[in-house]
């Protein structure tokens, strides 16, 4: 038995020593990544030690630094460039010149009211296709693009289910006006103003339906859209059916679990009581009498383990000369804050027939969404940090539905019970949205290089919701109008007509090309909103109290 123990001890010691030797061989490798053609530095290049999770990205000057051992292989990857691998040798400095992916330059990208090859694009254009999207349980289209395009910063607005994001292309341009980019989906410019009750302007698009993002960053690329594109343009193209393709059925589903991984460090009930006793001369005897006997962790009481699931089904193919794609999706996302969730149903239909020997191309796109949001009360998070941990959640007082409230103990002002805020506040909405367009692209028979394009689109959103707060959630305990009833409904409409002519001809004899576009665009926005707000008196509970006439 002693020999076996000694052998195990020897093997453990040997393993530790070998680990130290291997670790000691690692050195800091640094360098600069440039473009092989013009020697310009490349920021945002991914540098990874092959076969490991060790990696970094190049900074604004194309510089990188990471730990690696001699013999390790560094893999350099960047969108639009060929991957490159370099083996770490004796030198600690490895500079890399990356070559452009010629095949990528031949790809067609959407720009303005047309498409061009990447090699012909004169402005700053970045295209991100579905194979480069972020992976995982993604329910918002913006999350697909995070970190995938240089100069595009996407910041999630919050952790609530279905929350939107702030998008900036090459930073902000104004202190007072909007800095949001113009977003165009399948040729339809989207209104950046959400309908009441919605928190994400892109929530109607199922992330699984998106084929590419194209980001137009500079003035030459965005000029055709006018001043509304001063903050950049993001073009979203959804998936389509292919001519001659057989029926293809695809299903994608996932289940995710979320937890609050950290809390604000606050005093426990015991620590509060000890501090109060030590400073009783400061707090006063009356305040000490209000201390409870509990050790309530209010933050843990308002958070939960949230289980969410997402399901997507699509059918694509072609019926003779009619390519089609149909998809439906269902998302049930629960928030880690109690009483917050989102249920969303999305549907899309795409038909892309051609006529007259492909001279006339028709694109029909229809997308619909129904979303039910429970927003809860975000104020419960702040109350949970500030609430007295010596108090219990329930004290049995029928005047407050059994919950502990400072009002029951004669206080005039106090932190609301965070559990009441999280559970009793009824802040929910139902949002419906329908967006569709039909586009005709016709090559004139007498001049094939000249194409006429007509795009007709409509975007309609409507919502109804309420934010009803019972009297038990008010911090002001002397005003008789404790509770609030707030009901609203809203409608946003957006109609579009685009018509333009495009002449595109190659003069191979002189190695030149002409591309001219002229057109007319009309867009009309209409918004309506009605709301009713009133206070409730005494013990009325607005969650169950209908609005009174004249309130």
Label for each model-derived stretch:
Residues 1-355, 360-369, 377, 435-436:
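Short, small/polar-rich motifs associated with maturation and membrane association
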Residues 243-294, 336-340, 346-435, 453-551:
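Surface-exposed loop/interface segments of Gram-negative outer-membrane beta-barrel transport/assembly proteins
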